[in-house]
UniProtKB/Swiss-Prot annotation:
<feature type="transmembrane region" description="Helical">
    <location>
        <begin position="290"/>
        <end position="309"/>
    </location>
</feature>
<dbReference type="GO" id="GO:0031676">
    <property type="term" value="C:plasma membrane-derived thylakoid membrane"/>
</dbReference>
<keyword id="KW-0472">Membrane</keyword>
<keyword id="KW-0602">Photosynthesis</keyword>
<dbReference type="GO" id="GO:0015979">
    <property type="term" value="P:photosynthesis"/>
</dbReference>
<feature type="binding site" description="covalent">
    <location>
        <position position="65"/>
    </location>
    <ligand>
        <name>heme</name>
    </ligand>
</feature>
<dbReference type="InterPro" id="IPR011054">
    <property type="entry name" value="Rudment_hybrid_motif"/>
</dbReference>
<dbReference type="Pfam" id="PF16639">
    <property type="entry name" value="Apocytochr_F_N"/>
</dbReference>
<dbReference type="InterPro" id="IPR024058">
    <property type="entry name" value="Cyt-f_TM"/>
</dbReference>
<keyword id="KW-0813">Transport</keyword>
<comment type="similarity">
    <text>Belongs to the cytochrome f family.</text>
</comment>
<dbReference type="InterPro" id="IPR002325">
    <property type="entry name" value="Cyt_f"/>
</dbReference>
<keyword id="KW-0349">Heme</keyword>
<comment type="function">
    <text>Component of the cytochrome b6-f complex, which mediates electron transfer between photosystem II (PSII) and photosystem I (PSI), cyclic electron flow around PSI, and state transitions.</text>
</comment>
<keyword id="KW-0812">Transmembrane</keyword>
<keyword id="KW-0793">Thylakoid</keyword>
<dbReference type="InterPro" id="IPR036826">
    <property type="entry name" value="Cyt_f_lg_dom_sf"/>
</dbReference>
């Protein structure tokens, strides 16, 4: 005979199991039905390279999914002082009149994203350290650390490219006086930035933002168009029929009866985005060196002034001596 306590525990267990199953089912279904929606944006780098987004060769891992090379820029001060808030401005230029192929095959605007690798100790400045101007420039932006123990590696995106072609990162420099692991000196800064969707998923599968090519040599005998599922292109070869499936999005540029060679394009290339990298440097300046330099310059200026005054004095003495003579 079941007691009320056991019945209550049993009901809670059943509820927890149902919630877990529903959650997993929703996650799996969304990944299967809409795999392109979140593909090839900065957070995918966290999945494929959890330790660091920068390979030993210097390449940012985002380039594995975004195959087209595009321009990217980052502007930061040449040098900063300890515990200073400054702007790192990332520029991701592109032609805003162009639209990209979305996951469902329709056209839409481009999103942008970026990963900014700052030196150790540098991080996104807390809100209470931002000026009113900087708060306005970063309004609506959400910056995320690449990993819990890597505050200096920051990712953002996907966000609207029409609104954020320039992204302002509010950065706080470290203070060697409070952090003994930090030293004054010159440090490297690495940027990876993309606009638009990628061509390859982290699993290695191609997205619909690609140019698709024939898998065999032969003659195209049938082109079956399904607006929702894509297009099936049947190629008759010496070994039989081969069907190449083109997802919705790319435009088919071949016709029935056309001879085709393996590797020849079946569609246009719909990709209008791409990925870019930029490396730069920043100097964490020791204030004592600045004060010393200022004192040195002031000393030189005073010395020059004294020399000029002394020269004038000597000239007056010489002039007076000549008059007496």
């Amino acid at each position: 005979m079941k007691t009320p306590e056991l019945m209550a525990i049993w009901q809670r267990l059943k509820t927890a199991c149902l919630v877990a199953i529903a959650t997993f089912g929703l996650f799996f279904a969304s990944d299967v039905l809409f795999p392109q929606a979140a593909a090839a944006y900065p957070f995918w780098a966290q999945q494929t390279a959890p330790e660091t987004p920068r390979e030993a060769t210097g390449r940012i891992v985002c380039a594995n999914c975004h195959l087209a090379a595009k321009e990217a820029e980052v502007e930061i001060p040449q040098s900063v002082l300890p515990d200073q808030v400054f702007e790192a401005v990332v520029k991701i230029p592109y032609d805003h009149s162009q639209q990209q192929v979305l996951g469902d095959g329709s056209k839409g605007g481009l999103n942008v994203g970026a990963v900014l690798m700052l030196p150790d100790g540098f991080k996104i400045a807390p809100a209470d350290r931002l000026s009113d101007e900087l708060k306005e420039k970063t309004e609506g932006l959400y910056f995320q650390s690449y990993a819990p123990d890597q505050e200096n590696v920051v990712i953002i995106g996907p966000i609207s490219g029409d609104q954020y072609e320039e992204i302002v990162f509010p950065v706080l420099s470290p203070d060697p006086k409070t952090d003994k692991n930090i030293n004054y000196g010159k440090y490297a800064v690495h940027l990876g930035a993309n606009r638009g969707r990628g061509q390859v998923y982290p699993t290695g599968e191609l997205s619909n933002n690609n140019q698709f090519k024939a898998s065999a040599t032969g003659t195209i005998t049938n082109i079956a168009v399904n607006e929702a599922a894509g297009t099936d292109i049947t190629i008759s070869t010496e070994a039989g029929e081969v069907i190449d499936t083109i997802p919705a999005g790319p435009e088919v540029i071949v016709s029935e009866g056309q001879a085709i060679a393996a590797g020849e394009a079946l569609t246009n290339n719909p990709n209008v985005g791409g990925f870019g990298q930029k490396d730069t440097e920043v100097v964490l300046q020791n204030p004592a060196r600045i004060y010393g330099y200022m004192a040195f310059v002031a000393g030189i200026m005073l010395t020059q002034i004294f020399l000029v005054l002394k020269k004038k004095q000597v000239e007056r003495v010489q002039a007076a001596g000549q008059l007496d003579f």
